[in-house]
Amino acid sequence: MQTQPKVIMFTTPTCSFCNSAKRYLREKNIRFTEVDVSRDISAARDLQRRTGQTGVPVILINNRPIVGFDRPKINQMLNIRG
């Protein structure tokens, strides 16, 4: 049995790329934890410390960051075909 990777997505409510990324992961039945950095300042600081990024979305897959909604990289890291 393959364990599901740990996926955390840092977002804001007004980010259209965040909404697209969330929709994509849901379509692929990938469970993820969403962190709204506009409401959680400590999470925003943590995001910047971990990745050097202040923009969203940033998706952590098993603690490896993907900056932006980079579908090919998401597919590669989650072994999603097509």
Stretch-by-stretch model annotation:
Residues T11, T33-D36, V67:
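A structural signal for short, well-ordered beta-strand elements
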Residues S42-V58:
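Short Fe-S-cluster ligation motifs
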Residues R31-A43:
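Thiol-based oxidoreductase modules, predominantly thioredoxin-like and allied folds used
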Residues P57-V67:
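A short, hydrophobic beta-strand/beta-hairpin element that forms part of a small beta-sheet core
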Residues M1-K28:
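Local sequence-structure signature of Cys/Sec-based thiol-disulfide redox active-site neighborhoods
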Residues S16, S42, K73:
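Short alpha-helical
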Residues I74-G82:
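Thiol-/selenol-based redox modules, centered on thioredoxin-like
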